Amino acid sequence: MKKKQKITLYRIIITAVMLVVLQFLPITGIPRLIAYLAAYLVIGYDILRKAGKGILNGRAFDENFLMALATLGAFFLAIWTKSGDYLEGIAVMLFYQIGELFQSYAVGKSRKNISALMDIRPDYANIEKDGKLEQVDPDEVAVGSIIVVQPGEKVPLDGVVESGNASLNTSALTGESLPRDVKEGDEIISGCINLNGVLKIRTTKEFGESTVSKILDLVENASSRKSRSEAFISRFAKIYTPAVCISAVLLGIAVPLLRMAFGMDVAWVDWIYRALTFLVVSCPCALVISIPLSFFAGIGGASHEGVLIKGSNYLEALSDAKIVVFDKTGTLTQGVFEVTAVHHNTMDEAKLLEYAALAECASSHPISKSLQKAYGKEIDRSRVTDIEEVSGKGITAKVDGHEVLAGNAKLMALHNISYNDCHSVGTIIHMSIDGEYAGHIVISDVIKPHSKEAIQKLKHAGVEKTVMLTGDAKRVADQVAKELGIDEVRSELLPGDKVNEVEKLIQNKPKKANLAFVGDGINDAPVLTRADIGIAMGAMGSDAAIEAADVVLMDDDPMQIAKAIKISRKCIGIVKQNIVFSLIIKFGCLALTAFGLANMWAAIFADVGVMIIAVLNAIRALKYKE
């Protein structure tokens, strides 16, 4: 509890004790008024001061003004009627302050939780000087410097591991509890915690450009981007508060005057009491406080799961996502070619793979790398001679004196070698040894383990259509889409075509449905920007993703997409619950008050009670459960 909150708590306790004591003190008249006025000032002086400042600054119609007017009015009413019943006015202020303290504590707890979840800001960096480690501010470390990260310390800057190996806790960035292992030569990003081992890292970015700085900046600025709901509440409060003040004046003055004109009993005290109660009931605290808090908690809860949402406007838009468009490579697939099948004739499978890897050893093409990876042994280049690349067809070479052809069907046709057709999805490498067809190897982009389940979860979450965009051939794209259960495919696209396809989908979508585009953030910036919601996946270390997207998924697991949508819908559900609940209770109590069926105590519940319930509901957005 902060110092300001402690002072408020002490004031509440002192006032409560004073009220209990005053109930048993046999004092009347002026001494009684002074004693109760002292209790009132102890609990309400700050509200009176804020109300006064608001009037002087031209912002009279706020909750402080309503509370000050209602409670002072109750005091003057007790003085006027000489009843000596000052308890209600003080009780209203006391319970209002209890509600404010609770709200302040809840907001503070939410902020603390979010700070803990995003506790990735490094305090220092270790630089080695004269054989000793010196702690310096991360801002002072230049690009290319060597920093040392010891067990238990945060990685302060992005870089490459020069020496050492360790396990890293990346949970604050990705929401993933399993440690990530790094070794010499691996890229490493700031914000991770070194669990074991000493790492020497060569920095590749300044602190201001590092991943941790960009993420912190994103989270800190999220509250500045207001949602439609928050904008509505702001507009509502500007109209609502003056309207209820005018209604209270009409209730307390106009109604008695009207009754007087018709010769009815005026009952000034009764109607003024109703007007003051009306003011207490009307305070819009529950809405003004709980709606922004709901979004704040929702964004914080999402960040704990490795989902960074740039503002409450994007969180609200994400909740209306009905169409999700995927870029295939790197999003639904690994984006890395692998040997997925070896179909051989008489030659042994391992031997066929060995010939292919050796023949392709001079190439830097991804296909060559995937063959060498599948072979898994060190390449002995002395075994290979006469390597020749046949443009658009493949490679010819001599391996251990044998003439080897490795390429597509065109290469086989060029050398008049009959080959077997392959219906597997992927790139087919046909192999010929000494003029005889030896078989073929299938290389393809591997689908991520959770992609199919991710599509199913999206449909369960209410997404009506899934679309895949890819530059792959139609046959390959259709096969992937069928395997994953994707509704529509756009294949054989050039990079610029993707924006046009998204434009068409946006033009044809239902009016209130939003389109979300999911990419890996590397070359998708134009499409991420054009979609209603741009979602970048696997953004650890990707500046482009963090800059271009509205929602950033720190992990490359497609399951995170459905999780992000569910979090947004839970948050918006809480916002709607609070709006409906608050307005029903408020207007119900206002009607009861106007007809004289609710007293000041009911007014306190309608204000403070509703605010506490709404705040409790709002902080539910911090937690996400499957």
What are these regions (language model features)?
Residues 1, 116-209, 313-356, 398-399:
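Conserved cytosolic catalytic loops of P-type ATPases
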Residues 29-37, 60-66, 81-92, 232, ...:
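Membrane-water interface of transmembrane alpha-helices in multipass transporters/channels
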